[in-house]
Amino acid sequence: MAVAEQGALAGLRERTEEGHLKAGRVPPSQVEHGRQSGAVKILEERPIDQSIRDYIPPLITEDEKLLRGHGARQPSDDFTRTDPWRVLRITSEFIEGFDTLAPVEKAVTVFGSARVGPDDAQYTAAQETARLLAEAGFAIMTGAGPGIMEAANKGARLGHGRSIGCNIELPFEQGTNPYVDTVINFRYFFVRKTMFIKYSSAFIIFPGGFGTLDELFEALTLIQTGKIYHFPVVMFGRHYWAGLIRWLHARVLQERKISPGDLELMLVTDDPAEAATAVIDAFEARSAAPRV
């Protein structure tokens, strides 16, 4: 290879590395180093209950860049790293999401743990629930990852429905599961959450962790405050959710932090058919309701 060509390639690699760093992602050289040193392999083979924070390098995410405090802007600062520029990037994510999902007439978003394997009963239940809904004409949306998300996307494909994944970009992300037909990548969690709410007719919440709970309580808050109507929230897994339901009754309701009717916003079930029927019935009621 000629010296000039070698120099051009080196410059291209340098710009690529810099671009990844500015975007808060792991640059290719570090990913390759991670593979050679075993770091990526360790991440892929970590115990299922091990915190991912133990394996991800402390890079700054796009959300953190937006939310953390900033000092006075210096004349030498790159404009593309300032908040006004981020507003444009956020707007572009909304536009891409709206444009991609505009043809979706009715969809259900399925949430749940990424740490559930194909042999787990929850995986099977999520797959079956999604299959029933897909056969009824619903698209299935997930966070595009493994576990419950993969099961739901697989069920959508088995039911010959549209399988949608809204992926979030993170360092050493695990990638999109193989059953997603339409994928949208987001830098910002709040943009992705808007897509879930805007294009879903219901949420089905399988057992999961903080992210799953976040989506659960945001949906309940939007219903409670009248922002959305005829929006079923199905919590799948009676045993898993029993402690939370008891706490809501014994503590939150008893101390009058919520109203008795707020506890009727959730359906708890172990039956995929019951979950699917609740969603279908609510959608039909919503469609029949007069437009204001």
Question: Over which residues does each language-model region extend?
Answer:
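Hydrophobic alpha-helical signal/anchor motif
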Residues: M1-V3, V26
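C-terminal functional extensions of proteins
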Residues: M235-V292
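Glycine-rich beta-alpha loop segments
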Residues: G24, G34-C166, G175
